Amino acid sequence: MTKEFHHVTVLLHETIDMLDVKPDGIYVDATLGGAGHSEYLLSKLSEKGHLYAFDQDQNAIDNAQKRLAPYIEKGMVTFIKDNFRHLQARLREAGVQEIDGICYDLGVSSPQLDQRERGFSYKKDAPLDMRMNQDASLTAYEVVNHYDYHDLVRIFFKYGEDKFSKQIARKIEQEREVKPIETTTELAEIIKSAKPAKELKKKGHPAKQIFQSIRIEVNDELGAADESIQQAMDMLALDGRISVITFHSLEDRLTKQLFKEASTVEVPKGLPFIPDDLKPKMELVSRKPILPSAEELEANNRSHSAKLRVARKIHK
């Protein structure tokens, strides 16, 4: 059954306006979600332009088909139900060799967080799931109940940056020996019980970072983003642009590093000119990340941690 998507798009105008949209261009929304970015991008295209929209969540596609109906009727939209790590292969299958621009809105969409049964939220009691793609096999239940102590510590440190990772992993190990940990609230309580009392008084939910780390592991979010962004930069036409919105430091560091590698080059000393194969492919459109306005911060709480980075293709 299709559930309504109630999703406030973050950095809507900045993300699309920075793509410098050509009316007859070929564009990609790598993270369809609530379709806010797609809708605004389509409003800038002529009927000769086309948008390819990726999402691995069928619920997002079903809702977008309603929201974008006027553009679908004109043949301006193609939906691709897949992980964006397969971006290049799926676009090539569709006959696309080059794109004029692409946008990413990384992280979990509000509707996924709000659907209790998806198991993303520590605030709502639900089975441990956290799959963005409901057809995927690995769930949060598997991670929490079957990963060994060392693997749990690794993902809690690496993806959650939680300094109490060892204590939390040990507590999970103890609890699951008694009985399986089955729900989000069970896990949240175990995490709380593993932390010192003074930590529980700090701002923010004590389970937030651990839930984030499990979600990233279940969906291989950073691995997928790394592969996809590199493919996107390869597929950009000259002067094409890429916009990436991130919501936590791990995503932002990854995006910053990928853009840096593509926009800088180490040239051997003494070369009178830079050979074509050494020239950087990209240039940064803005040196620093673009942040939400004061108005947006007030209107949309989700936007507080958002950062937008944009780069442009300057060399094939």
Swiss-Prot record:
One of its GO terms (biological process) is rRNA base methylation. Keywords: Cytoplasm, Methyltransferase, rRNA processing, S-adenosyl-L-methionine, Transferase. GO terms for molecular function: rRNA (cytosine-N4-)-methyltransferase activity. It catalyses: cytidine(1402) in 16S rRNA + S-adenosyl-L-methionine = N(4)-methylcytidine(1402) in 16S rRNA + S-adenosyl-L-homocysteine + H(+). S-adenosyl-L-methionine binds at A35, G36, H37, D55, F84, D105, Q112. It is an enzyme of class 2 (transferase). The keyword Cytoplasm applies. One of its GO terms (cellular component) is cytoplasm. Its EC number is 2.1.1.199. The keyword Transferase applies. Its main location: cytoplasm. Belongs to the methyltransferase superfamily. RsmH family. Specifically methylates the N4 position of cytidine in position 1402 (C1402) of 16S rRNA. This is Ribosomal RNA small subunit methyltransferase H. It comes from Streptococcus pneumoniae (strain Hungary19A-6).
